[in-house]
Design a protein with these regions (language model features):
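Active-site micro-motifs of SAM-dependent methyltransferase domains
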Residues: 16, 34, 64
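GHKL-family ATP-binding catalytic core of two-component histidine kinases
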Residues: 18-20, 37, 107
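A short SAM/SAH-binding and catalytic strip from SAM-dependent methyltransferases
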Residues: 25-37
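S-adenosyl-L-methionine-dependent methyltransferase catalytic module, highlighting the catalytic core
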Residues: 6-11, 40-148
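Residues marking the start of alpha-helices
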Residues: 13-15, 32, 102
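A short acidic, Gly/Pro-enriched loop at the edge of an enzyme's catalytic core
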Residues: 12-27
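SAM cofactor-binding core of SAM-dependent methyltransferases
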Residues: 1
Length: 148
């Protein structure tokens, strides 16, 4: 499913990558998973390609006061989008006029969903730093580890 663009940039479907099983030590994803309709499949695929003890580091909008992940939209088997809430679009530097649909807003239940996908441990890391001039809201990173 993966390919390399004419600019040398690798593109993969996070729900069905072309990487071999247990071939990567670390997978990182930054502000992508909220745009993936079947994010649970992306979790399972990431676990598949990680070596035992490998780490999955990712960021996405995370609602720390929200227990459950909220589905904003879904897709049918034919790819048709069904909106469950008012559509929310995030900025897209490649298509600034269009934006990218947000399918979900993650809550604390995502830690259980990562476990269901095969990760042994997962934590939410809140980072704020005066010395590094990260003075706004905390940066929220989720770290999951595949069992050894």
């Amino acid at each position: 499913s993966g390919y390399v663009s004419h600019r040398g940039i690798r593109h993969e479907d996070v729900t069905a990558t072309s990487f071999a099983s247990a071939s990567l030590d670390v997978v990182m994803s930054f502000d992508v998973l909220e745009h993936v309709p079947r994010y649970e499949a992306a979790f399972a695929e990431t676990c598949r390609v990680l070596r035992p003890g490998g780490h999955f580091l990712w960021t996405a909008p995370f609602r720390r006061n929200q227990e459950k992940t909220i589905k904003r939209a879904t897709t049918t088997e034919t790819g048709e989008i069904t909106h469950l809430l008012t559509p929310q679009y995030h900025g897209d530097p490649l298509r600034p006029d269009a934006g990218v649909l947000c399918f979900q807003e993650f809550g604390w239940s995502v830690l259980d969903e990562l476990k269901e996908a095969g990760f042994e441990k997962s934590v939410v890391v809140l980072t704020w730093s005066w010395s590094n001039v990260n003075l706004g809201p905390e940066l929220i990173t989720i770290r999951a580890q595949k069992s050894l």
